[in-house]
């Protein structure tokens, strides 16, 4: 797990600071924004995956693609890093700039999380196809 905190005086008080949260290998995992005004997180954040495999756990939703990419990092790193940067750019550009309710902040966190899960799921499938005959 890794996180970055950012005090954001240029954002409305309802948004406030942002915790950019990631799991597994922080160099490979997406950052999910959690705002000071957030009151709910996606369900998968409450499921522990440290000692058992659970595909509904946030950890395992990113770990599978991360591990596959690591095995052949020389051939995956450029595309992988492009997807991380695109995800982070989209997440930053969508941060609410006006006064918003906690429900909107919750929905934005969920939206960024859902987009990241979909991207990492696509990468996992891509890597299984790429490496099906062996690593």
What is each PLM-predicted segment?
Residues 1-135:
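C-terminus-biased signal that marks the final domain/tail of proteins
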């Amino acid at each position: 797990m890794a996180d970055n905190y950012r005090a954001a005086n240029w954002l409305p008080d309802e948004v406030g600071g942002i915790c950019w949260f990631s799991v597994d290998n922080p160099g490979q995992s997406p950052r999910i924004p959690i705002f000071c005004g957030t009151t709910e997180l996606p369900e998968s954040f409450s499921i522990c995956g440290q000692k058992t495999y659970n595909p509904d756990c946030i950890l395992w939703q990113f770990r599978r693609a991360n591990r596959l990419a690591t095995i052949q990092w020389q051939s995956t790193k450029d595309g992988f890093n492009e997807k991380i940067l695109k995800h982070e750019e989209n997440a930053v550009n969508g941060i609410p700039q006006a006064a918003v309710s906690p429900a909107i902040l919750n929905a934005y966190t969920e939206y960024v999380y859902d987009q990241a899960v979909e991207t990492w799921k696509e990468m996992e499938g891509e890597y299984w196809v790429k490496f099906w005959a062996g690593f």
